[in-house]
Regions:
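A helix-coil-helix interface module used to build multimeric assemblies
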Residues: 2-166
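Single conserved hydrophobic/aromatic residue that forms the stacking wall/gate
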Residues: 165-173
Length: 173
């Protein structure tokens, strides 16, 4: 699959915030946060990492140049190595990724992306439930025809139907 292949589902349906989490730049920013956290932990465990190096990484972590990384990857033929080289070149130090494998990085970052994505979904779901509750309150006395087995049934109110949907169990029972 080409690096420039468009993900139709993401392009059409994902929110800007979700695309920021799962996009190339978002992933790189999370990787850099991960590397900095690991370097700090390694230093606290006695590995010789100068404070200036950590400060340098922190000062350049938001400088993402996808084109430069892509050019490095064309030479290294390894995506993670290219991102390591880019970050080290920006910081002027070579202390990240000590003792790590590519999978250590990518698996942890993927878990962070999943967590951030779920947090975003939770926020949006809560906002939707609040809106539904507001509408249920506003239109609580509106009479409508209930349905059972997709057939019209007795009269009920919009408030009752909305409340039913708001209180459905979410654990699959």
């Amino acid at each position: 699959m080409s690096k420039n292949t468009v993900n139709i589902l993401a392009e059409r349906y994902a929110s800007k915030e979700m695309n920021q989490i799962w996009g190339a730049e978002g992933r790189i920013l999370l990787e850099r946060d991960y590397w900095i956290a690991v370097v700090k932990a390694q230093k606290s465990l006695g590995i010789d990492i100068p404070d200036e190096a950590i400060e340098a990484y922190e000062s350049v972590k938001d400088q993402v140049n996808l084109q430069s990384i892509q050019e490095r990857e064309a030479v290294t033929r390894h995506d993670v190595k290219a991102r390591i080289e880019e970050f080290c070149a920006l910081a002027g130090h070579e202390h990240i990724h000590k003792g790590l494998t590519s999978r250590d990085l990518t698996e942890n970052v993927e878990q962070l992306q999943i967590l951030r994505g779920l947090e975003l979904i939770r926020i949006k779901a809560m906002a939707s439930l609040i809106k539904l509750a507001e509408k249920a309150e506003k239109w609580s006395q509106l009479v409508l025809t209930a349905r059972t087995h997709n057939v019209p049934a007795q009269l009920t109110t919009f408030g009752t139907v909305s409340y039913t949907h708001l209180t459905l169990p979410t654990n699959g029972t």
